[in-house]
Amino acid sequence: MRTLTLCWLALLALAVTGVLLGGAGDSPWLLAAVLACAVAKGWLIGERFMELAHAPALWRRLLLAWPLLMALAVGAALYLARMNN
């Protein structure tokens, strides 16, 4: 139970950090930090709350690949939108 509490606190800290960074300005580095927070939250949820830490390596890699791909897609879309303005 202690591990889940620590994970919950980490998720809370990552969520607050993402919100604060998202409202701090409009810089590519801030965007990267917000997306990194989102990927870290996805990893924590998969590894601890969904208990995939003991799952086969393929499932763990696929679960981490999804938030990474989504973060890359969002980052690329925002980069392209910035280039067009």
Curated annotation (Swiss-Prot):
Its main location: membrane. GO terms for cellular component: plasma membrane. Keywords: Cell membrane, Membrane, Transmembrane, Transmembrane helix. It is a multi-pass membrane protein. The chain crosses the membrane at residues 4-24, 27-47, 61-81. It comes from Pseudomonas aeruginosa (strain ATCC 15692 / DSM 22644 / CIP 104116 / JCM 14847 / LMG 12228 / 1C / PRS 101 / PAO1). The keyword Lipid metabolism does not apply. It comes from the Bacteria. This is Uncharacterized protein PA0522. It is found in: Cell membrane.
